[in-house]
Amino acid sequence: MIDDDGYRPNVGIVICNRQGQVLWARRYGQHSWQFPQGGINPGETAEQAMYRELFEEVGLSKKDVRILASTRNWLRYKLPKRLVRWDTKPVCIGQKQKWFLLQLMCNDADINMQRSSTPEFDGWRWVSFWYPVRQVVSFKRDVYRRVMKEFAVTVMPMQEQAAQRQTPAYRRKRG
């Protein structure tokens, strides 16, 4: 499903743990990394597509996560000309995305990138919140920067709380 401007409706998923780190996934058989994402099927809402993609790409279900936020607006990126499939109609020149910030509510061991018969990813790791902005392919970088800036207001307090839990409390000596 491509809109009149040539953009494919899509959802992007940022999964964070209790420390405010985000799940960074390696594309199957490649050296490139990204957040899980995928197309919205006809008749499907963005939230329904997000849960479907979450299961297909990461092996998690609705009970394994909690929605913390979603982007206010659709965000777009254009594909480099070398990646556009000019022989298909309608021609898709890029993606327009609704992004979701999810908190992982289950164990890391429940993440299963191999649940689908055609996996999108073959590995993953937790990375610092801003790491993906510097590491994603260049044509997605502006969208990632905007997504992370919007989600930072939700994740930064989580990181501060995690740091406080890790900092030992010092008691004053009585003399």
From Swiss-Prot:
GO terms for molecular function: mRNA 5'-diphosphatase activity. Its cofactor is a divalent metal cation. Residues 6-149 form the Nudix hydrolase domain. It comes from the Bacteria. Its EC number is 3.6.1.-. Keywords: Hydrolase. A motif (Nudix box) lies at residues 38-59. It is an enzyme of class 3 (hydrolase). The keyword Hydrolase applies. One of its GO terms (cellular component) is cytoplasm. Belongs to the Nudix hydrolase family. RppH subfamily. HAMAP family: Nudix_RppH (MF_00298). NCBIfam families: PRK00714.1-1, PRK00714.1-4, PRK00714.1-5. Accelerates the degradation of transcripts by removing pyrophosphate from the 5'-end of triphosphorylated RNA, leading to a more labile monophosphorylated state that can stimulate subsequent ribonuclease cleavage. This is RNA pyrophosphohydrolase. The gene is rppH.
